[in-house]
């Protein structure tokens, strides 16, 4: 061989594995073994050097002046022979067999013998098995064995799935202190305080004699001022445990005062009036009409916890006058106008598919619709009204994602484009819009059980292109256009009393504005103020009846689709 060859260190990929395999064969044939581990009268031949290399426990045993240092036999207490066999297999093969049946013995044994790899494998296995019925037990198990990452994962899981967790026996069997720790946490994800109150009452009722005295202590961590007045009067006031306790009554009176005396709310701020962080939800804004005076395909995501915007993959077709809803971790972008024609096509974002999500087409609607209203009820998507390029529609259709099919339903009484569609207490409401001649203030509701539309009390103001959302038993209608002016005004419909009230106006007029609810607050997104497209967002707090501007999007737009999705 000619030329000068430089030396090179070469590492093979098989050497370490080959050595392990050879040592395991020597162990199984009891060759060169220099120690025997005795567990439950069963002997396990092994090599001191291998045990010491894998375990600090054995390293200390064989290198210090412990009595076992020179003994040919070592008795191991605190684990079973079956568990010892699994642990030795790991020492010699790098593989551990973890099952639901053995993990509760395997993890403590791994901690005892200081086998970090087995401990980590058990923790990862238990984390993969978390569900609402076992997360509290796994959290305690992890805490006992100082598995910090697993304990935190179980804690987060119990917070994220609180309404389901409290339905299971593990919650009912918690101590008072453990219940307090859970319900006082800001991070539990609930849409309202109702499941928190009900969890406390159910826990007390499970052992009434022993736990009744604990109710006032627990109830102070329920944020009753954030409950609706109706729930306070109809449910909490009727609860016998509450009526029999002066301390509990004081907490209920505080909640009533919070609602009846809004001028005192600023003085009553504290832990019970602070909203929980809620579900890990994000706001998505899709398509619309952009600053280039044409439909756009841009998708942006807002995280209310960080107050930051980021971009997601664009929709496959540019659309304005678009409707959008979320259902089962998917976002549906429905109809709209691409600059040439109104659309019946529907795109779906599978947000669980990968880091950013994947857009794909689903079945088109039966009717082309721009400026249609869209909402969800149960497992279905409902779309009503809209403009097909020649006429406004009274029709409504429903999409079943399980069979990827649209079906026509009963017609509205009035043709509408630019109307809002929202569900409240199982009823679909369609609000305002434009019928081709007039801007509308009329409102009609659809009962899915009868298939019929009926009129309800109209809005105080005619509005088309308004944002509509449900918050605390009230349907809020924000902004829009009344035929002469772009509106900043906001009104709220009480579904219980069939009546409207005016609330504080937005800081900016907004037409073709998106509206949605996130973490107990109402968001008004982008729109057109009569002079320019907007990228600004403002947020309404119903407790203090006030709007504040939050972080702006990167894109100015109106006519966009807006919805909320639970973050991965």
From Swiss-Prot:
Presence of the UniProt keyword Ion transport in the record: no
Gene3D superfamilies for the chain: 1.25.40.420, Kelch-type beta propeller, Potassium Channel Kv1.1, Chain A
Segments forming domain BACK: 135-236
Domain BTB: 33-100
Post-translational modification: Ubiquitinated by the SCF(FBXL17) complex, leading to its degradation by the proteasome: ubiquitination by the SCF(FBXL17) complex takes place when aberrant BTB domain dimers are formed.
InterPro entries: BACK, BTB-kelch_protein, BTB/POZ_dom, Gal_Oxase/kelch_b-propeller, Kelch-typ_b-propeller, Kelch_1, SKP1/BTB/POZ_sf
Subcellular location: Cytoplasmic vesicle, COPII-coated vesicle
Subunit structure: Component of the BCR(KLHL12) E3 ubiquitin ligase complex, at least composed of CUL3 and KLHL12 and RBX1. This complex interacts with DVL3 upon activation of the Wnt signaling pathway by WNT3A. Interacts with DRD4, KLHL2 and SEC31A. Interacts with PEF1 and PDCD6/ALG-2; interaction takes place in response to cytosolic calcium increase and leads to bridge together the BCR(KLHL12) complex and SEC31 (SEC31A or SEC31B).
Protein's recorded name: Kelch-like protein 12
């Amino acid at each position: 061989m000619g030329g000068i060859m430089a030396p090179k260190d070469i590492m093979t990929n098989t050497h370490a594995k080959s050595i392990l395999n050879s040592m395991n064969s020597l162990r199984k044939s009891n060759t060169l073994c220099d120690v025997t581990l005795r567990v439950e009268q069963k002997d396990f031949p092994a090599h001191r050097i291998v045990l010491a290399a894998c375990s600090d426990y054995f390293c200390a045993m064989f290198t210090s002046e412990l009595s076992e240092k020179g003994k040919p036999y070592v008795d191991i207490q605190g684990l079973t022979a079956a568990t010892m066999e699994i642990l030795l297999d790991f020492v010699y093969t790098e593989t551990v067999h973890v099952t639901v049946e053995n993990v509760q013995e395997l993890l403590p044994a791994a901690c005892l013998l200081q086998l970090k790899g087995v401990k980590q494998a058990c923790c990862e296995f238990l984390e993969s098995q978390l569900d609402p019925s076992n997360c509290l037990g796994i959290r305690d198990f992890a805490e006992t064995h100082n598995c910090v990452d697993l304990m935190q994962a179980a804690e987060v899981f119990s917070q994220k799935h609180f309404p389901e967790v409290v339905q299971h026996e593990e919650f009912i069997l918690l101590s008072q202190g453990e219940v307090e720790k859970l319900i006082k946490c800001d991070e539990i994800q609930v849409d309202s305080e109702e499941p928190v109150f009900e969890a406390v009452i159910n826990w007390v009722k499970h052992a009434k004699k022993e736990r009744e005295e604990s109710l006032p202590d627990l109830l102070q961590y329920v944020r009753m001022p954030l409950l609706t007045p109706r729930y306070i009067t109809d449910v909490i006031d009727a609860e016998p445990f509450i009526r029999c306790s002066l301390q509990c009554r004081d907490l209920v009176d505080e909640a009533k005062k919070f609602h009846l005396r809004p001028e005192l709310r600023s003085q009553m701020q504290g832990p019970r009036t602070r909203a929980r962080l809620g579900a890990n939800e994000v706001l998505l804004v899709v398509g619309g009409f952009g600053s280039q005076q044409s439909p756009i395909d841009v998708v942006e995501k807002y995280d209310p916890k960080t107050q930051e915007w980021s971009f997601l993959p664009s929709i496959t077709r540019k659309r304005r006058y678009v409707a959008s809803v979320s259902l089962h971790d998917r976002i549906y972008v429905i109809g709209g106008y691409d600059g040439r024609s109104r659309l019946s096509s529907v795109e779906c974002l599978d947000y669980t598919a990968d880091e950013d999500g994947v857009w794909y087409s689903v079945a088109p609607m039966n009717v082309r619709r721009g400026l249609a209203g869209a909402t969800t009820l149960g497992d279905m998507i409902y779309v009503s009204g809209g403009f097909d390029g020649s006429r406004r529609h009274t029709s409504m259709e429903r999409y079943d994602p399980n069979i990827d099919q649209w079906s026509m339903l009963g017609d509205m009484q009035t043709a509408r484009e630019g109307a809002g569609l929202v569900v409240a207490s199982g009823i679909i409401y369609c609000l305002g819009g434009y019928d081709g001649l007039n801007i509308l203030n009329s409102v009609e509701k659809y009962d899915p059980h009868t298939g019929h539309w009926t009129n309800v009390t109209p809005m105080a103001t005619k509005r088309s292109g308004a944002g509509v959302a449900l918050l605390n038993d009230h349907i809020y209608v924000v902004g829009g256009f009344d035929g002469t002016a772009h509106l900043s005004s906001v009104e709220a419909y009480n579904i219980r009393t069939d009546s409207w009230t005016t609330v504080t106006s937005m800081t900016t007029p907004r037409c073709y504005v998106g509206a949605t609810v996130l973490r107990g607050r109402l968001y008004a997104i982008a729109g057109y103020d009569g002079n320019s497209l907007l990228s600004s967002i403002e947020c309404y707090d119903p407790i203090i009846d006030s709007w504040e501007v939050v972080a702006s999007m990167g894109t100015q737009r109106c006519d966009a689709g807006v919805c909320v999705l639970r973050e991965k």
